[in-house]
């Protein structure tokens, strides 16, 4: 769920790091359209696509099991859609971490008018 995803992001990037990803680029935050602006925005695009493939539960609300082991996010013994949601969130949190050095503050709170290009397909 979104609370667990927040904890994953903060666990990988530090306390309150999630605040940098709430409204960044064209895809980080609610909804999304256009072309991802940078690697961070691409992480969000891929995460949105991943959630779109989940069947059988609501990715934003369903509670799954996971833990941090030696700094790595490990999804627990979840079944079906819970496993899929955990994997979506784990991959995105790792993606943010891998691209933290290219995070661009200029894309925070980006106007939707800058995201009007034809949206990419998942």
Swiss-Prot record:
Cystine pairs: 26-115, 28-44, 43-95, 49-122, 50-88, 57-81, 75-86
Catalytic function, reaction form: a 1,2-diacyl-sn-glycero-3-phosphocholine + H2O = a 1-acyl-sn-glycero-3-phosphocholine + a fatty acid + H(+)
Keyword Calcium appears in the UniProt entry: yes
Keyword set, alphabetical order: Blood coagulation cascade inhibiting toxin, Calcium, Disulfide bond, Hemostasis impairing toxin, Hydrolase, Lipid degradation, Lipid metabolism, Metal-binding, Neurotoxin, Presynaptic neurotoxin, Secreted, Toxin
EC primary class: hydrolase
Any GO BP annotation: negative regulation of T cell proliferation
Chief subcellular location: secreted
Protein's cellular compartments: Secreted
Residues reported to bind Ca(2+): 27, 29, 31, 48
Active-site residues annotated for this sequence: 47, 89
Tissue: Expressed by the venom gland.
Family membership: Belongs to the phospholipase A2 family. Group I subfamily. D49 sub-subfamily.
General function of this protein: Heterodimer: presynaptic neurotoxin.
Name of the protein in its database record: Basic phospholipase A2 CbII
Organism in which the protein naturally occurs: Pseudocerastes fieldi
């Amino acid at each position: 769920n979104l609370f667990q995803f927040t904890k994953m992001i903060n666990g990988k990037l530090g306390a309150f790091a999630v605040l940098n990803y709430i409204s960044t680029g064209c895809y980080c935050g609610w909804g999304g359209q256009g072309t991802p602006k940078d690697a961070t925005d691409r992480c969000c695009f891929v995460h949105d696509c991943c959630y779109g493939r989940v069947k059988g539960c609501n990715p934003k609300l369903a509670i799954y099991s996971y833990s941090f082991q030696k700094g790595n996010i490990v999804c627990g013994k979840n079944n079906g859609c819970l496993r899929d949601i955990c994997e979506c969130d784990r991959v995105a949190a790792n993606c943010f971490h891998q691209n933290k050095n290219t995070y661009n503050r200029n894309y925070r709170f980006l106007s939707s008018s800058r995201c009007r290009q034809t949206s990419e397909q998942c």
